[in-house]
């Protein structure tokens, strides 16, 4: 078992060394505000304003669900207002035996 594990580790390291990049891009200083247009490191990768479909001009509708805090009810709502209305106007069953004992 140990020989197999050692062999696997050696093989993993050999493959990892072969796949490692040969040239590294020099990192800029953290407080550097200048961005050079011919610098590969500054022009590659995602930007802060890059949002996939949104940057392509498509409208992205964000969906968020709101849940009733009562675990027995567990209904979902599209808006916070619907959830608040449900909580204010619904008699909920108790969440647990502990809640029944405290009443």
Swiss-Prot record:
Keyword Signal found: yes
GO molecular function, one term: zinc ion binding
Chain positions of all zinc fingers (C2H2-type): 66-92
UniProt keyword terms in alphabetical order: Host nucleus, Metal-binding, Secreted, Signal, Transcription, Transcription regulation, Virulence, Zinc, Zinc-finger
Compartments in which it is found: Secreted; Host nucleus
Superkingdom classification of source: Eukaryota
Keyword Transmembrane included in the entry's annotation: no
Residue segments, region Disordered: 82-103
Signal peptide start and end residues: 1-19
Chief location bin: secreted
One cellular-component annotation, GO: host cell nucleus
Induction: Expressed during multiple stages of host plant infection, including the prepenetration, early biotrophy, late biotrophy, transition and necrotrophy.
PROSITE patterns xrefs: ZINC_FINGER_C2H2_1
Function: Probable secreted effector that translocates into the nuclei of host cells to reprogram the expression of targeted genes by binding on effector binding elements in rice.
Protein name (database record): Host transcription reprogramming factor 6
Organism: Pyricularia oryzae (strain 70-15 / ATCC MYA-4617 / FGSC 8958) (Rice blast fungus)
Origin organism lineage: Eukaryota, Fungi, Dikarya, Ascomycota, Pezizomycotina
